[in-house]
Amino acid sequence: MRIHILGICGTFMGGLAMLARSLGHEVTGSDANVYPPMSTLLDKQGIDLIQGYDASQLDPQPDLVIIGNAMTRGNPCVEAVLEKNIPFMSGPQWLHDFVLRDRWVLAVAGTHGKTTTAGMATWILEACGYKPGFVIGGVPGNFEVSARLGESPFFVIEADEYDCAFFDKRSKFVHYCPRTLILNNLEFDHADIFDDLKAIQKQFHHLVRIVPGQGRIIWPENDINLKQTMALGCWSEQELVGEQGHWQAKKLTTDASEWEVWLDGEKVGDVKWGLVGEHNMHNGLMAIAAARHVGVAPAEAASALGSFINARRRLELRGEANGVTVYDDFAHHPTAILATLAALRGKVGGTARIIAVLEPRSNTMKMGLCKDDLAPSLGRADEVFLLQPPHIPWQVAEVAEACVQPAHWSGDVDTLAEMVVKTAQPGDHILVMSNGGFGGIHQKLLDGLAKKAQNVTAY
């Protein structure tokens, strides 16, 4: 079959392209911007990429077009597909019909930690000899790709609540039919497609409804939003994580780089790994619980996490210059910002200076729906720098004024980088947070800090 994918350079759609290629299909695709690393990965798989959406790319006509959720009516390719009656479907629908139908699916859903937790679950199964398939919204550090078919019935998927396509506004995860389901947490997000928390809870409950009776749902007992969702009805086995639940994680070090796994009052494993932060400890515990459902002993799963490498942009060290370390993180919601800063504080200690640099870039952030929570979420930083995005209905100056620590802002990335470099002293830690490229600020900071060091040496 010849398959053409519209919007192929997103992590999810690129992952589907790799799976389709592995199944023996001829695969081509297009995107508005064909860019690395996805373009490089796809090129290696022998997948032809086309820049832009000129309708001529559909000649000769493919057997099937998979349409990404960024595509809208009016797109030349979308219009040609409809006009010529070319068979089409969404990415999640294709994944269900051609890959997941006969698999034991382990799905990881939730507002935060999906990529990390899915990566952990995949690595546990891999390290324990299960050779799982997977589709993850980032390239897990232990693998070179974001998706593969695998060689066993088990398939791990990052289950996103975003919608499927312009013709299917349900959350992607309703197509995945998991047997093992992790619900990490639930908060209001994606304000561009959800009106309120109840609308998200409704979609999450659709997911709960399709887990079989012999399936298992693993969720944190202290999450009130999930508790409300589960109260709408559950027909599957449940395992709760938390103080009053079946599973607990007990921290042995302040940065959570070492912790114990407890199940039903008994210690069943020890984790000593390269990650830090209680949020990662929580993610790891969820992954261990999910792996147990498919047959991995908790002690083996805990041991496997010792060699887990996270996906990029998860408290990733980008470099050091003039004695200042620069970290990058994908955090783009107050809860994630709070957790990431707490993790870094645990890592560097209570007296080291942390400088937080934030770009409010997600749709929810831009709409200002969580701006009142931003200043409190930045509380563990010693100094804050904020980028003012253009064309948003609120001012980051409001957040700067609400911060208890010194806080500054600029509408220009270069200016903001210069401000940070001027402030930063040897021994400081800079944490850059955004779900985008932030105008290449990481390298600008490292270059500026190196130049500052040279100037000091010159004197």
Predicted regions and their residues:
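Switch II (G3) loop of P-loop NTPases
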Residues: 154-164, 326-332
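Conserved motor-coupling elements within RecA-like helicase/translocase cores
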Residues: 149-151
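Conserved RecA-like helicase motor-core motifs
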Residues: 28-30, 129-136, 241, 408
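Switch II of P-loop NTPase G domains
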Residues: 163-177, 335-343
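Walker A (P-loop) phosphate-binding motif
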Residues: 4-5, 19, 91-140
